[in-house]
Design a protein with these regions (language model features):
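ATP/NTP phosphate-donor binding region
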Residues: 1-52, 56-68, 96-104
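Catalytic core of DAGKc-family lipid kinases
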Residues: 2-3, 8-12, 70-207
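Short helix/loop capping segments that flank catalytic or ligand/cofactor-binding pockets
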Residues: 10-11, 141-142, 220-222, 284-285
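Short, solvent-exposed amphipathic alpha-helical segments in soluble enzyme
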Residues: 16-19, 66-67, 147-149, 227-230, ...
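Hydrophobic/aromatic beta-strand patches that form the interior of the parallel beta-sheet core
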Residues: 50, 77-79, 236
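Glycine-rich phosphate/pyrophosphate-binding beta-alpha loops
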Residues: 135, 139, 210-225, 288
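Short, conserved beta-strand edge motifs with alternating hydrophobic and charged residues
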Residues: 187-189, 210-214, 236-238
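ATP/nucleoside-binding phosphotransfer catalytic cores, i.e., glycine-rich phosphate-binding loops
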Residues: 198-205, 221-307
């Protein structure tokens, strides 16, 4: 088990144990320590790798584990102990899932297959990152606002709700120079064809208000931003924050995706892979990464324990 003692719900808590089950626990403090710990676990032989933390911990374990496991990963499971735990929602795990629950589900063979997003910088020589939710534009601002919500004590669904309310207010009542309305320089293209993703006549062709992409099938709070037919990489792209779109937003998030949305500037897209060029930072599973050019592919097929 990779145990992140800094995760929100692990602070001040004692580590769980399961009678009759041998669990090797590592608590790396840096990413280099994490890579060494994963290598040691792999050398010893491992059947189940438990990730005790939030979405950011999962991202780091998957990213640093690429060089260790390649395409032959052990079965994975998540104990949701972070400020955000979107992957656990998709896997069907309850927020209070315990170590004994995970072990029981693993022994019963309750598993699902998932592929993470593989994000590779085109302009820097560094390993690809693996994560499940990537966003840019106003999504980055939303995550920053969410960190403010965390600092005043809002977490999970409450933090999402508070952040969404603040962002919508900025869009509806802010001026065009407001950073929540001005958008981000963002070139998006399908790969490997290089075909540009569609852009409506609203806003500047080189700018987008928000981009969100994921391989998850279920989102937190029951949000149905993506359509059922979208796969394998599901994208939602908003060209410009028009009031007509935001008036329909509650219905859109509940799964109503009428045909006029694309002409109005909200696109629901599917891709095998895509590229993005940004002039502002983006977010991968809760963490900022620098502006630049990136290739987004599907990572290796992973097996996760499910509830």
């Amino acid at each position: 088990m990779v145990y992140n003692s800094r995760s929100h719900r692990n602070k001040g808590q004692s580590m769980e144990h399961v009678d009759g089950v041998e669990i090797d626990v590592v608590q790396p403090s840096t990413k280099d320590d994490l890579a060494r710990a994963l290598s040691a676990l792999h050398a010893d032989g491992i059947d189940l790798l438990i990730i005790n933390g939030g979405d950011g911990t999962v991202r780091d374990v998957l990213t640093m584990g690429q060089a260790v496991f390649g395409n032959e990963w052990p079965v994975l499971s998540v104990l949701p102990r972070g400020k955000t735990n979107a992957l656990n929602v998709d896997l069907g795990g309850p927020p209070d899932w315990s170590l004994s629950d995970v072990v029981a589900a693993y022994e019963e063979g309750n598993c699902v297959k998932r592929r993470a997003l593989m994000v590779t910088a085109k302009d820097r020589d560094e390993p690809a990152m693996l994560g499940f939710i990537i966003g840019a534009g106003a999504f980055t601002l939303g995550i920053e606002a969410g960190q403010d919500a965390h600092r005043i004590g809002f977490f999970d669904s409450l933090a999402v709700g508070a952040t969404a309310a603040w962002g919508i207010a900025q869009v509806l009542f802010g001026s065009n120079s407001n950073q929540w309305r001005s958008g981000t320089e963002m070139n998006l293209a399908y790969e490997p064809s290089g075909e540009p993703m569609p852009h409506s006549r609203h806003g500047q062709p080189s700018r987008r208000h928000i981009m969100l992409a994921s391989t998850l099938q279920r989102m937190p709070m029951g949000i149905q931003l993506f359509g059922k037919g979208q796969a394998p990489i599901r994208l939602a792209v908003l060209d410009r924050p028009r009031r007509r779109i935001f008036a329909a937003l509650p219905a859109v998030l509940a799964g109503w995706h009428p045909g006029w949305l694309s002409k109005a500037g909200l696109h629901h897209l599917s891709a095998e892979a895509f590229s993005m060029k940004l002039d502002a930072p983006f977010i991968l599973d809760g963490e900022h990464f620098p502006a630049g050019s990136y290739q987004i592919d599907q990572g290796p097929e992973l097996t996760f324990v499910s509830a």
